[in-house]
UniProtKB/Swiss-Prot annotation:
Pfam families named among the record's database cross-references: Kinase-PPPase
NCBIfam families registered for this protein in UniProt: PRK05339.1
Catalytic class of the enzyme: transferase
InterPro entries: Kinase-pyrophosphorylase, P-loop_NTPase, PPDK_reg
Positions contributing to ADP binding: G150, V151, S152, R153, T154, S155, K156, T157
Described function: Bifunctional serine/threonine kinase and phosphorylase involved in the regulation of the pyruvate, phosphate dikinase (PPDK) by catalyzing its phosphorylation/dephosphorylation.
Name assigned to this protein: Putative pyruvate, phosphate dikinase regulatory protein
Organism, as annotated: Lacticaseibacillus paracasei (strain ATCC 334 / BCRC 17002 / CCUG 31169 / CIP 107868 / KCTC 3260 / NRRL B-441)
Signal peptide: none
Length: 276
């Protein structure tokens, strides 16, 4: 029987950093079902006490991402008095950076959410990904920071949107054997192109499940091994001709594939867009 794990995220901003961290850590405990409760925009001592009182009542772990001066210390002391396990995430990092830079932190909650130029660049990149999804307009390949090529079910669209959230303009093109490859592809720097592939068994099983879900015969040409192998071979030959990076997305998450692409491009994985 799955046990419950209550995780309370306390923040003087939206609490996104604490939530992501809690989710990442909770994933390491598969025998527990995690329940997340956010307490955002905590700007008073009373709200700190109230959140910790509730955490005590529910036997929850409190994860705190305060940057407001004094809040983390106050919450830590109160949690200790109440017998609540509370983790102060931000203070050690702030102290570490302070030691290296000899600068005092601003202690401004939510500073990363300011509507600055980077924010609007990200919105523009998201719009670009939607506009040039699935090769809708070949001219997008010439304007893109990254061009994704791939057979079906290699996560081209979600990967495009994920990278767009890193302020990168991404266009993608689905590959079908003997289909016309737009001339624009050959004008793109191969270093900007990423070829996505997968394992034949993974692609076949996914297609079989899709046909079953549609109430159709799962053993059609769409999912037949010869057809799948033909598609993968077509893509492999094209990637060799282009001379681009190739990534097998089988058993890889969107985040893992994106990290490989960003490393290949020499880009910072987080691109300064993480939220708190």
């Amino acid at each position: 029987m799955t046990q419950e794990l209550n995780l309370y995220i306390m923040s003087d901003s939206v609490g996104e950093t604490g939530l992501r961290l809690a989710q990442a850590v909770a994933a390491q405990f598969p025998n527990f079902e995690a329940h997340y409760v956010r307490f955002p925009f905590i700007h008073t001592e009373e709200k700190i006490y109230s959140a910790l009182d509730e955490a005590k009542k529910e036997n929850a772990l409190a994860i705190m991402t305060f940057v407001t001066s004094g809040f983390a210390q106050l919450a830590t002391h109160y949690a200790k008095d109440q017998g609540v396990i509370a983790i102060d995430v931000m203070s050690p990092i702030l102290s570490g950076i302070k030691s290296i830079t000899h600068e005092e932190p601003n202690h401004v909650p939510g500073a990363v959410h300011d509507l600055n130029e980077r924010y609007f660049d990200r919105i523009s990149a998201m719009e670009f990904a939607v506009l040039y999804d699935d090769g809708k307009d070949p001219k997008g390949f010439l304007e893109a920071d990254i061009v994704l090529l791939g057979v079906s079910r290699t996560s081209k669209t979600p990967l495009s949107l994920f990278l767009a959230n890193r302020n990168l303009k991404v266009a993608n093109l689905p590959l079908v054997p003997n289909a016309h490859i737009p001339e624009e592809i050959w004008s793109v720097d191969p270093k900007k192109i990423v070829g996505l592939t997968t394992d034949a068994s993974v692609l076949m099983e996914f297609r079989r499940q899709r046909m079953i879900a549609y109430g159709l015969n799962p053993d059609t040409a769409y999912s037949a091994r010869d057809q799948v192998n033909q598609e993968l071979k077509f893509a492999e030959d094209l990637y060799k001709k282009i001379g681009c990076m190739v990534i097998n997305t089988a058993h890889r998450s969107i985040e893992e594939t994106a990290t490989l692409i960003l490393e290949h491009m020499g880009l910072d994985e987080f691109d300064n867009t993480e939220t708190h």
